[in-house]
């Protein structure tokens, strides 16, 4: 499996476990589901999803902000997630490079290792989108 596939599978599996939705992403927990996280955990996940919807800022801008913040905070899973979301909403490679630049300026040289992994993930995600 590739890093991209590993990330997607891990995220899906653990989100289902945390949210108690079994095999159905987004489903309401039922009697056969594992209990998962608390109501507060589920509320936080819902708030996170709602925060990235269109508002005064569009989804594309919010995802780029999320990516820059994730790089500065040095969260590799968050970086991968936001790169994937950025590509899904039409952020160009050039725009991603500018987001990376902002993160480098704000976060400093400690961001460089995360930049390397971000570029690697971006390249793989883009190649998957181009593949038939």
Regions found by a protein language model. Name each.
Residues 41, 81-93:
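Iron-sulfur (Fe-S) cluster-binding segments and ferredoxin-like electron-carrier domains
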Residues 49, 66, 83-87, 100:
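Amphipathic alpha-helical segments within well-ordered protein domains
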Residues 52, 73-74, 91:
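Residues in soluble alpha-helical coiled-coils and helical-bundle/repeat scaffolds
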Residues 1-61, 111-132:
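Acidic, glycine/proline-rich low-complexity segments that act as flexible tails and inter-domain linkers
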Residues 62-70, 99-103:
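Alpha-helical scaffold segments that form or flank carboxylate-/histidine-based iron centers
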Residues 65, 69-81:
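Short, thiol/selenol-centered motifs that function as redox-active sites or metal-ligating centers
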Residues 105-110:
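Glycine-rich phosphate/pyrophosphate-binding beta-alpha loops
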């Amino acid at each position: 499996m590739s890093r991209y596939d590993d990330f997607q599978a891990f995220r899906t599996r653990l989100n289902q476990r945390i949210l108690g939705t079994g095999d159905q992403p987004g489903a309401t927990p039922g009697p056969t589901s594992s209990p998962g996280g608390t109501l507060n955990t589920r509320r936080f996940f819902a708030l996170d999803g709602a925060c990235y919807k269109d508002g005064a800022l569009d989804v594309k801008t919010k995802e780029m902000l999320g990516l820059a913040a994730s790089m500065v905070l040095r969260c590799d899973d968050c970086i991968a997630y936001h790169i994937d979301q950025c590509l899904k909403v039409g952020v160009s490679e050039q725009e991603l490079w500018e987001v990376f630049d902002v993160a480098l300026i704000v976060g400093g040289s400690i961001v460089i290792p995360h930049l390397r992994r971000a570029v690697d993930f971006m390249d793989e995600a883009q190649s998957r989108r181009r593949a038939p």
